[in-house]
Curated annotation (Swiss-Prot):
This is Methicillin resistance regulatory protein MecI. It comes from Mammaliicoccus sciuri. Transcriptional repressor that constitutively blocks the transcription of the gene for the penicillin-binding protein MecA. Binds DNA as a dimer. SUPFAM superfamilies: Winged helix' DNA-binding domain. Monomer and homodimer. The gene is mecI. It holds the Pfam family Penicillinase_R. The lineage of its organism: Bacteria, Bacillati, Bacillota, Bacilli, Bacillales. InterPro entries: BlaI_family (IPR005650), WH-like_DNA-bd_sf (IPR036388), WH_DNA-bd_sf (IPR036390).
Amino acid sequence: MDNKTYEISSAEWEVMNIIWMKKYASANNIIEEIQMQRDWSPKTIRTLITRLYKKGFIDRKKDNKIFQYYSLVEESDIKYKTSKNFINKVYKGGFNSLVLNFVEKEDLSQDEIEELRNILNKK
């Protein structure tokens, strides 16, 4: 997985979030969860599952004739690598540019400012 780019579509993130939440989920479980929030057809959702499987983000095991899907990547790892790819593309690898952009444009609460200070002081 380390050699692959961590490119996941917004729709694929929704599938991954369900799999991370449930640990193991059948296609029908995933379909039910997504259809509570989205008006997507079962075929569309199965296509997303297949894409994630082919990309190597998830795997499956058969349990009583039903495939149970599970993640092959840690949620925190993929979020970090996806964020890093984004920073490299948009900010040319300049993490400080990203942070400065958000700090300057966002209204931060005192708690958020204090949390940022604490994180920076630990570095």
